[in-house]
Amino acid sequence: MYKGIFLCVLLAVICANSLATPSSDADEDNDEVERYVRGWASKIGQTLGKIAKVGLKELIQPKREAMLRSAEAQGKRPWIL
C-alpha cells in the first residue's frame, strides 16, 4: 500500500518538475522576434525624430534669403549680415 502511494507521489513530483521548467526553444524564438521588432521600432523612431527636427526648424526659422530680399525691396537695410 505504501509502495503505491510512494510511486504516485514520485510520479507527481517528476511531472510537476518537468512542467515547471520552460523549454529553451520557445524562449529563443521569442527573444529573436522581440529583438527584431525592437530594432525596427528604434530605427523608425530615430527617423521620425530626425524628420520632425528638420520640419520644426523649417517652420520656426525663416529663410535668410527671403528676409534679405524683402528688406531690399522695401528699401530698408537688412539686419542680417
UniProtKB/Swiss-Prot annotation:
Keyword Ubl conjugation carried by entry: no
Signal peptide: 1-20
Cellular location(s): Secreted
Residue numbers covered by the propeptide annotation in the UniProt entry: 21-37, 65-73
Any GO CC annotation of this UniProt entry: extracellular region
Tissues expressed in: XPF is synthesized in the stomach and stored in a novel granular multinucleated cell in the gastric mucosa, it is stored as active, processed peptides in large granules within the granular gland secretions of the skin.
Disulfides per UniProt: none
GO biological process, any: defense response to bacterium
Membrane-spanning residues: none
Entry keyword set: Antibiotic, Antimicrobial, Cleavage on pair of basic residues, Secreted, Signal, Vasoactive
Family from the record: Belongs to the gastrin/cholecystokinin family. Magainin subfamily.
Function as written in the Swiss-Prot or TrEMBL entry: Xenopsin is a neurotensin-like octapeptide. XPF has antimicrobial activity.
Name of the protein in its database record: Xenopsin peptides
Organism expressing this protein natively: Xenopus laevis
